[in-house]
Amino acid sequence: MPQMAPINWLILFFIFSITLVIFNILNYFCFSYTPMKTSQSLNIKFNKLNWKW
């Protein structure tokens, strides 16, 4: 395997880093979150108790 010059490794590292950052930014901003309605997703009945001390 031929040796590569250090400047080549540096360029490859920067290209990989920039690609990784762009990929992560695109995944972060392209994610569309659609929340469910709270009344349908949570069926919790609250019992109100009046404590008389």
From Swiss-Prot:
Gene Ontology MF annotations: proton transmembrane transporter activity
Keyword Membrane: yes
Coiled coil stretches, renumbered: none
Membrane-related topology note: Single-pass membrane protein
Compartments, as annotated in UniProt: Mitochondrion membrane
Biological process (GO), any one: proton motive force-driven ATP synthesis
InterPro entries noted in UniProt: ATP8_metazoa (IPR001421)
Gene Ontology cellular component list: mitochondrial membrane; proton-transporting ATP synthase complex
Key words of the record: ATP synthesis, CF(0), Hydrogen ion transport, Ion transport, Membrane, Mitochondrion, Transmembrane, Transmembrane helix, Transport
Principal place of residence: mitochondrion
Entry keyword Transmembrane helix: yes
Database matches in Pfam families: ATP-synt_8
Domain of life per record: Eukaryota
TM segment ranges: 9-29
Similarity comment text for this entry: Belongs to the ATPase protein 8 family.
Biological role stated in the UniProt entry: Mitochondrial membrane ATP synthase (F(1)F(0) ATP synthase or Complex V) produces ATP from ADP in the presence of a proton gradient across the membrane which is generated by electron transport complexes of the respiratory chain. F-type ATPases consist of two structural domains, F(1) - containing the extramembraneous catalytic core and F(0) - containing the membrane proton channel, linked together by a central stalk and a peripheral stalk. During catalysis, ATP synthesis in the catalytic domain of F(1) is coupled via a rotary mechanism of the central stalk subunits to proton translocation.
Subunit field text: F-type ATPases have 2 components, CF(1) - the catalytic core - and CF(0) - the membrane proton channel.
Protein name from the UniProt record: ATP synthase protein 8
